[in-house]
């Protein structure tokens, strides 16, 4: 009979995916306030900062040349062009955090999530849906950040983005923010209680109790 050994800690990778305006960023900020142990992966982007955003907090804001340098140097785990701007996830921070046993949270688009899955097959995708396209349009307009033609372009793209929801393990319908946040917290908690996660985080205890490794 094989038993669990003292394996190196390995954290979970959570990916929050959504079309623009579904409430992804607000949910991620609220989740981090609720659970500071989560490590937010700070993506690089060539888009301009939105009101209230700070470089190095929500995103690392870079120009096209710097983004190209990072991409060409293979320093990005994934990258994609979304609504005319480039987004990418630095590789080192995720590797270091998961090796140290920390859970990592990525706020990402479906293209990036697909690439992350190639590197981390056990990554958990959480797709956030709006309650309706009409509500999505209302939220985009209420943000007051985009011109009408930009909003129209985002709405046009939303259908294609939503079509990739089946690629995620979980789906949250963000109709009531407090309910959606509770559901997001529950997903994180449930993932941490999986046998595979508990076996790594509590390897010594499992070994002492004689719990066999999962096959």
Curated annotation (Swiss-Prot):
Gene Ontology cellular component list: cytosol
Classification via Pfam families: Guanylate_kin
All copies of domain Guanylate kinase-like, residue ranges: 11-189
EC number of the protein: 2.7.4.8
Top class in the EC scheme: transferase
Record flagged with keyword NAD: no
Keyword ATP-binding in annotation: yes
InterPro entries according to UniProt: GK/Ca_channel_bsu, Guanylate_kin-like_dom, Guanylate_kinase, Guanylate_kinase_CS, P-loop_NTPase
Family under the similarity heading: Belongs to the guanylate kinase family.
Protein name (Swiss-Prot/TrEMBL): Guanylate kinase
The gene coding this protein: gmk
